[in-house]
Amino acid sequence: MKTLFLATSIALLAAMPTAYARPDNVPDLLAAVTFGTGERINGSGRIIDERRPLSAFGAVHLTGPVDVELKASDRESVTVRTDDNIAPLIETRVTGGDRPALEIGVKAGASFRTSRAPVVVVEFRALSELVVRGSGDVRADRISADDFVLSLSGSGDAKIDSLQAHRFAAALAGSGDLVVRGGRAEEQAYRLSGSGDVDASRLEGRSVQVAIAGSGDASVNASETLEATIAGSGNVTYRGSPRITQRIRGSGSVHRAH
């Protein structure tokens, strides 16, 4: 059951269609954020907090050059923080029917330039899924769930201050990094394809699986078992005293943290 959940979760994340598919043209120029190729709107410099109504959700899907702050709460809410003339270009909506997800992105055809990336502050009651595509970064204060799955594709990073879960599965494709600063997830699985790294060395776990295809590195913490499969130059560093099963093709390695 454990292996089935972890494998199925990562496969579903990899196959998930992209909501808000947009050109991800976001060069970093003089600390400005530029998005899109059409007629461009320049940010006014007047930063506002725009609170928006929304219905309940259990997942967050982010696309584009928007940063997200996730905050555990006893309610659901969303606040858009950006220039007053850019806020109308940032879309937030709940979709999905039986599995509602908060979709965050940029309106089709929008093109803008701001001094800093728009920020969407999300309060949530419960969260079981986080999908990040593009250049947006996500920061979460704490997440508590039975099963939690996460997907990063592109250059966006995800940082979680504290995670409490029974099962946790994460898939990284691209250069985005994942950092989990603390907590516990009994069963963990990570799939890395690209150059993105995982630092979950402070996320305690009992059983951990890592699959790397590329140059990404993973730091994990396992007390009983560690299964590592590496194809390429990626490395797995571990804490704890797990029983290790490893399959390596390439220059990658598995070693204990110093």
Describe the residue ranges of each PLM region.
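Acidic (Asp/Glu) and glycine-rich low-complexity loops/linkers
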Residues: 5, 19-133, 137-151, 162-169, ...
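Short, surface-exposed interaction patches in beta-rich subdomains
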Residues: 162, 178-258
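Bacterial N-terminal signal peptides
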Residues: 7-15
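An anionic oxygen-ligand recognition environment, strongly enriched in 2H phosphoesterase
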Residues: 158
